[in-house]
């Protein structure tokens, strides 16, 4: 069984691109370019890709909702009074120990929302698994992930345009954490990665 590691090349890529000295890209171009780079990485295969060689055409190019900057919102981390271990269920039925860091409080589409942020052993960034009203229809039924780089201020940007599928979506050999009930959002999040079906339009 292979574990889906929480460190995400995708979020790191956005940070790296924003730090270069070339003329600044537009928000849409930056996200689109990172999506293209993820396709290239997965297509190369090897340890960088969860996709089996025989399944490349089934999953690539990855499918996304259209980029919508209104899904990128500020959030305030309310730290947990005591950091406790949470036994997070996984796609294989086992439990994985993660640390509950606190609650991200934000507003989206006029609705006040919150998501619990976790820390996985060996990682410094925040891990935010979530599901929403598109889960199981337009997006993967087991939810999606967002990774956040730590900040000194406790202010974060939750960008659902970079929400991505767990590796077990592509390959059942991977063991993936499942979003807890507290991270089920009662609205549709039509941003980020979605399922690629025969009749879906591939959007980058």
Give residue ranges: language-model regions.
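Bacterial N-terminal signal peptides that target proteins for export
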Residues: 1-10
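C-terminal motif of bacterial Sec signal peptides marking the signal peptidase cleavage site
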Residues: 17-19
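Bacterial signal peptide processing site
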Residues: 21-23
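N-terminal secretory signal peptides
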Residues: 30, 35-103
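Mid-length scaffold segments of soluble, non-membrane domains
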Residues: 79-142
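Acidic, glycine-rich flexible loop segments
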Residues: 131-164
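Beta-strand/loop-rich accessory regions of lumenal/periplasmic or secreted enzymes
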Residues: 160-169, 175
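Acidic/polar low-complexity flexible segments
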Residues: 175-202
């Amino acid at each position: 069984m292979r574990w889906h590691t929480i460190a995400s090349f995708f979020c790191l890529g956005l940070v790296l691109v924003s730090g270069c000295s070339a003329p600044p890209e537009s928000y849409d171009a930056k996200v689109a370019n990172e999506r293209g780079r993820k396709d290239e990485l997965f297509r190369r295969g090897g340890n960088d890709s969860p996709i089996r060689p025989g399944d490349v055409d089934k999953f690539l190019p990855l499918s996304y909702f259209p980029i919508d900057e209104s899904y990128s919102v500020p959030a305030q981390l309310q730290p947990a009074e005591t950091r406790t271990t949470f036994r997070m269920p996984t796609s294989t039925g086992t439990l994985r120990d993660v640390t509950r860091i606190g609650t991200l409080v934000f507003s989206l589409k006029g609705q006040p929302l919150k998501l619990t942020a976790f820390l996985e052993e060996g990682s410094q960034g925040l891990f935010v698994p979530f599901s929403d009203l598109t889960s199981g229809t337009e997006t993967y039924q087991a939810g999606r992930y967002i990774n956040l780089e730590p900040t000194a201020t406790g202010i974060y940007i939750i960008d659902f345009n970079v929400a991505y599928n767990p590796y077990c979506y592509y390959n059942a050999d991977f063991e993936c954490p499942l979003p807890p009930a507290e991270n089920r959002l009662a609205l549709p999040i039509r941003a980020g990665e979605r399922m690629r079906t025969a009749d879906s339009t591939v959007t980058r």
